[in-house]
Curated annotation (Swiss-Prot):
Cysteine pairs bridged by disulfides in the record: none
Known function: Catalyzes the phosphorylation of the position 2 hydroxy group of 4-diphosphocytidyl-2C-methyl-D-erythritol.
UniProt family annotation: Belongs to the GHMP kinase family. IspE subfamily.
Descriptive protein name: 4-diphosphocytidyl-2-C-methyl-D-erythritol kinase
Gene name of the encoded protein: ispE
Record keywords: ATP-binding, Isoprene biosynthesis, Kinase, Nucleotide-binding, Transferase
Protein's UniProt keywords contain ATP-binding: yes
UniProt-listed Gene3D superfamilies: 3.30.230.10, GHMP kinase, C-terminal domain (3.30.70.890)
Species this protein is from: Escherichia fergusonii (strain ATCC 35469 / DSM 13698 / CCUG 18766 / IAM 14443 / JCM 21226 / LMG 7866 / NBRC 102419 / NCTC 12128 / CDC 0568-73)
Pathway(s) annotated for this protein in UniProt: Isoprenoid biosynthesis; isopentenyl diphosphate biosynthesis via DXP pathway; isopentenyl diphosphate from 1-deoxy-D-xylulose 5-phosphate: step 3/6
Enzyme Commission number(s): 2.7.1.148
Record note on quaternary structure: Homodimer.
Enzyme class: transferase
BP terms from Gene Ontology: isopentenyl diphosphate biosynthetic process, methylerythritol 4-phosphate pathway; terpenoid biosynthetic process
GO MF assignments: 4-(cytidine 5'-diphospho)-2-C-methyl-D-erythritol kinase activity; ATP binding
Length: 283
């Protein structure tokens, strides 16, 4: 039997770089919120212990794909602790709507959905804390998708405090370029010493993203989309880009602006939600 599992997008409603560790990783403060929009992962169980991704991603080797890595990591961890039935495997396919290199967390969300779904389907019984710990080894953004609640994140993104920001409507636009995260984080002009503030203080301030100035400088497409969106509503970069978003109080306001978008702009309208669609589907 095939089951389907949501793999939602996220937005960074704000993102501030507060320092850089000796190992090169940047410390940050950011606010994650999910969207009721994303990829869909389909899983069909196998009884031969194999993991097969039926929808490979162009340019990504099978074993390097985060979906496959997440499945194998859970399999190895559960088997080592005697929590995996012999022969447990899966055929996995994905209906991909989220762009790669877009700052919407697509790959991290895919990995988290696979961890949560296979833990359920294989009846491994790993706790949410255990799954989040596994997720962190796959990527800094994976734990927030595993836990499934909007969160204020610190450290390199792994220290999470659940929060409930307003659930607004967003017009999310993709400029048609992919921005590798290292391109932003290695730029010498990236702000790296934004003062740390409490979540209470940050929620009262105007939101911004320290990566935005670099993305706009290096990618004229990002600058063009943001310049257009800012004529209509508060708008900013999510993550390290390339996607940008404008916020609205109602769906109709967001759709009216999308209808006026120039032909070169690709976008969609979605609602911000504090409970992940993945976790809502499991209630």
């Amino acid at each position: 039997m095939r089951t389907q599992w949501p793999s939602p997008a996220k937005l960074n409603l704000f993102l501030y770089i507060t320092g850089q560790r000796a190992d090169g990783y940047h410390t940050l403060q950011t606010l994650f919120q999910f969207l009721d929009y994303g990829d869909t992962i389909s899983i069909e169980l196998r009884d031969d212990g194999d993991i097969r991704l039926l929808t490979p991603v162009e340019g990504v080797e099978h074993e390097d794909n985060l979906i496959v890595r997440a499945a194998r990591l859970l399999m190895k961890t559960a088997a080592a602790s005697g929590r995996l039935l012999a022969g447990s495997g899966a055929n996995i396919s994905i209906d991909k709507r989220l762009p790669m290199g877009g700052g919407l967390g697509g790959g991290s969300s895919n990995a988290a959905t696979v961890l949560v779904a296979l833990n359920n389907l294989w009846q491994c019984g790993l706790s949410m804390d255990e799954l989040a710990e596994l997720g962190l080894t796959l990527g800094a953004d994976v734990p927030v998708f595993v836990r499934g609640h909007a969160a204020f994140a610190e450290g390199v993104g792994e220290i999470l405090t659940p929060v409930d920001p307003p659930e607004k409507w967003y017009l999310v636009a993709h400029p048609g370029v992919s921005i590798p995260t290292p391109v932003i984080f290695k730029d010498p002009e990236l702000p790296r010493n934004t003062p740390k503030r409490s979540i209470e203080t940050l929620l009262k301030c105007e939101f911004s993203n320290d990566c935005e100035v670099i993305a706009r400088k290096r990618f004229r497409e990002v600058d063009a989309v943001l310049s257009w969106l800012l004529e209509y509503a508060p708008s900013r970069l999510t993550g390290t880009g390339a996607c940008v978003f404008a916020e609205f109080d109602t769906e109709s306001e967001a759709r009216q602006v999308l209808e006026q978008a120039p032909e070169w702009l690709n976008g969609f309208v979605a609602k911000g939600v504090n409970l992940s669609p993945l976790h809502r589907a499991m209630l």
